[in-house]
Regions:
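Short, glycine/acidic-enriched loop or turn micro-motifs at the edges of active sites
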Residues: 58, 86, 196
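Compact, glycine/acidic-enriched structural inserts
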Residues: 87-124, 129-133
Length: 333
């Protein structure tokens, strides 16, 4: 949320009941299904002031992709979804495009060897997307996450289904990617897109189902069953917030470790001169919940396919995976 955005930059959609939707979609088509999703969210009684929609807003599972949902006293698990903490990381190097080899095959091979990716055997034993032998560095950093994870499992043992520590520092599948890219000055960057892997998926699905059952038990009618929520002070509210914050920390660390592995692998490939990385480094979520303060109120802000844009914040807007396209590294003003 940005409390002082000039009104002329967005359209205002006023629902029959509820708060307005501020849509930064001037000159951009807004599909009917996405519009209805936004209106469904806007009529919930705990939405704080307004719902925001970004220029690339589109229909999504659970909630509209490219939306910002501020809530007071409640949280909607499906609005975050099952890839909790999904986001981007990019680092700038001191390499120039002309220093890259004509054939990037060996660099690609080094990256693919350094970062487990994909998924086989339904994520079970022998899954190519998990570590078979976890690197020492990853084991050490997993220990910083483990005490909080164990505390979550004590209350919700159904979440303990393996593939947690051996997913830290791995890419996953779907639209997650790693790439070597160039900026407008032909400087080389490394960029990746990933989240909280299997453990975040389990937590998301588990609490989404718990929230739906809560709505049934309390006879709460919703415009969309995906908008099932936990109210502050109820049994599962604190448990969900604890789990989602942990999964977001896992996701951020997951991206950080992968980037370390990528930079190390490219350096060791023998294809390039010794280079400096992390001249600039951005690591940001775009599927997450954050505790924030707006208009002198403590609230929760859920961003689905959106990043925080306070003055000076850095963010990444990726293009479509696997195409000749442009991604953007941006600074909020």
């Amino acid at each position: 949320m940005n409390d002082d955005m000039p009104e002329q930059t967005y359209n205002v959609i006023v629902p029959e009941k509820g708060v307005p939707v501020k849509a930064w979609t001037k000159g951009v088509p807004l599909e009917d299904k996405a519009r209805q999703q936004l209106l469904n969210v806007a009529q919930l009684p705990f939405i704080f002031r307004w719902v925001a929609a970004m220029p690339d807003v589109h229909w999504g599972i659970g909630a509209t992709v490219g939306s910002v949902i501020p809530t007071k006293g409640a949280v909607i698990p499906a609005a975050v979804g099952v890839d909790i903490g999904c986001g981007m990381m990019a680092v700038q190097t001191d390499l120039n495009a002309r220093e890259l080899p004509d054939d990037l095959k060996r660099i690609r091979g080094a990256i693919e060897k350094a970062v487990p990716h994909g998924r086989t055997n339904h994520g079970g034993r022998g899954d190519v997307g998990a570590w078979r032998e976890i690197p020492t560095r990853n084991v050490e950093l997993w220990q910083t996450l483990k005490p909080r994870y164990d505390a979550i499992l004590e209350k919700h043992p159904k979440l303990d289904r393996g593939n947690t520590s051996n997913h830290l520092g791995t890419l996953g599948t779907g639209n997650h990617f790693i790439e070597v890219c160039l900026d407008e000055a032909d400087i080389v960057w490394f960029m990746l897109h990933s989240g909280s892997r299997g453990v975040g998926n389990r937590m998301g699905n588990y609490f989404i189902e718990v929230a739906r059952k809560d709505m049934q038990r309390l006879f709460i009618n919703l415009p969309d069953k995906d908008l099932a929520y936990f109210s502050e002070g109820t049994e599962y509210f604190d448990d969900y917030v604890e789990a989602v914050e942990w999964a977001q920390d896992f996701a951020r660390l997951n991206r950080h470790l992968m980037m370390e592995q990528i930079v190390g692998a490219v350096r060791d490939s023998g294809e390039l001169r010794p280079f400096v990385a992390e001249l600039k480094a951005i690591n940001c979520h775009h599927n997450y919940v954050a505790r924030e303060r707006h208009y002198n109120q403590n609230i929760l802000v859920t961003r689905k396919g959106a990043v925080r844009a306070r003055d000076g914040d850095m963010g990444i807007i990726p293009g479509s995976m696997g195409r000749v396209r442009t991604s953007f590294v941006a600074r909020a003003i």
